[in-house]
């Protein structure tokens, strides 16, 4: 186990900056997930930690030791890749133990440690097989075993589950979490899949455009997104976001004429300003179209998810999602009313995309990331 300190880390390709001064502290034994869309810089950051990419600026320290100038093998990290990177001509046992063989570890010690790793990952029946005779999930476990046997200070996972089908991904997520509980090693996991991120992370690091947007627990990031980007990226369905202006009466006006009456204490300081109103699908509920204060819309389509349903509504071309927690009869084309839980709304500055703090929640002791 080892803490990791990242200070002002930058990466340029030529004159093009791709990572912009990232600062991050990772505690010893913590499981961090770096989440973001393709091209956000998450894999580049991981590769800089591993030593596979040179750092343009800043400093990375692992277990208190600055590693900027160290070779990958000197950093105490083991990496698991998306494509497994197994030797096809070697057996499972040979693949797992290869790093020890190169390091000159005795055959008896190699066999002992291969046996321990194989038992931990349920690979004992497959030790004599070659990768071509394994399923995708088994190959990924071999790749994890090859990292485990090195007994690293830090595990680095670069989208390791992307090639697996949905059922295998669920199984491997559980496998990785159990592995982390057993070994306690500091782990950094990169993904664009928010389900993976939310289920695996002790803390999430959400990246966009080479910058860190937010760091927090999955619960904090989901319930208190600090930017318009995080609000729209994290969560399925994405947070409902409506851009408009707070008029002189403290009413939120969007789409030129549609109005939402906000609580006075939220609206008063923002009169005349353009803001983005955000709310999760579960912060709204269906009511009669003529109910007092209801937003009127048309049910576009209903997403059946088994234990729950999502109604995707149409506000004259503006999308809006409502999570149904009870048996409400609604079908495509029905006129609907939507009631909003104003305690769960978020307001973002339209120009910067950053959260506008809620003074009422702050006074009540709410924590904002």
Curated annotation (Swiss-Prot):
Q: What is its main location?
A: membrane
Name the catalysed reactions: sn-glycerol 3-phosphate(out) + ATP + H2O = sn-glycerol 3-phosphate(in) + ADP + phosphate + H(+)
Q: What is this protein called?
A: sn-glycerol-3-phosphate import ATP-binding protein UgpC 1
Which positions fall inside the ABC transporter domain?
Answer: 4-234
Q: What is its EC number?
A: 7.6.2.10
Keyword DNA repair applies = no
Organism phylogeny: Bacteria, Pseudomonadati, Pseudomonadota, Alphaproteobacteria, Hyphomicrobiales
Q: Which organism is it from?
A: Rhizobium johnstonii (strain DSM 114642 / LMG 32736 / 3841) (Rhizobium leguminosarum bv. viciae)
Sorted alphabetically, which keywords does the UniProt record give?
A: ATP-binding, Cell inner membrane, Cell membrane, Membrane, Nucleotide-binding, Sugar transport, Translocase, Transport
State the function annotated in the UniProt record. Part of the ABC transporter complex UgpBAEC involved in sn-glycerol-3-phosphate (G3P) import. Responsible for energy coupling to the transport system.
| Membrane topology (UniProt) | Peripheral membrane protein
């Amino acid at each position: 186990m080892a803490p990791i300190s990242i200070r002002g880390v930058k990466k340029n390709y030529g004159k093009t900056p791709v990572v912009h001064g990232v600062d991050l502290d990772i505690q010893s034994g913590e499981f961090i997930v770096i989440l973001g869309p393709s091209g956000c810089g998450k894999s580049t950051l991981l590769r800089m930690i591993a030593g596979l990419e040179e750092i343009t600026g800043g400093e990375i320290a692992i277990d208190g030791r600055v590693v900027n100038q160290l070779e990958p093998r000197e950093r105490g990290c083991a990496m698991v890749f998306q494509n497994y990177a197994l030797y096809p001509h070697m057996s499972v046992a040979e693949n797992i133990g290869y790093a020890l063989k190169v390091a000159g570890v005795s055959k008896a010690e190699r066999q002992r440690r291969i046996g321990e790793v194989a038992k931990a990952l349920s690979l004992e029946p497959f030790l004599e097989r070659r990768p071509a005779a394994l399923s995708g999930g088994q190959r990924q476990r071999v790749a994890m075993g090859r990292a485990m046997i090195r007994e690293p200070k830090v595990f680095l996972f670069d989208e390791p589950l992307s090639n697996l089908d949905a059922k295998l991904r669920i199984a491997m997520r559980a496998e990785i979490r159990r592995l982390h509980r057993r070994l306690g090693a500091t782990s950094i996991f990169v993904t664009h899949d928010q389900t993976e991120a939310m289920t695996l992370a002790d803390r999430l690091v959400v990246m966009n455009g080479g910058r860190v947007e937010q760091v927090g627990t999955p619960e904090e990031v989901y319930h208190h997104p600090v930017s318009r980007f995080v609000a729209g990226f994290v969560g399925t369905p994405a947070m409902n976001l409506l851009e408009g202006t707070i008029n002189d009466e403290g009413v939120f006006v969007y789409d030129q004429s549609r109005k939402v009456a906000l609580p006075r204490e939220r609206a008063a300081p923002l009169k005349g300003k353009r803001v983005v109103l955000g709310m999760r699908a579960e912060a709204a509920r269906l009511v009669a179209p003529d109910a007092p204060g209801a937003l009127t819309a048309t049910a576009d389509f209903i997403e059946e998810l088994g234990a729950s349903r999502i109604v995707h509504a149409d506000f004259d071309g503006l999308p809006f999602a409502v999570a149904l927690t009870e048996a409400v009869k609604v079908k495509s084309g029905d006129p609907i009313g939507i009631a909003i839980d104003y305690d769960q709304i978020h307001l973002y500055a339209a120009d910067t995309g950053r959260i506008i703090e809620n003074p009422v929640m702050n006074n009540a002791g709410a924590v904002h990331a």
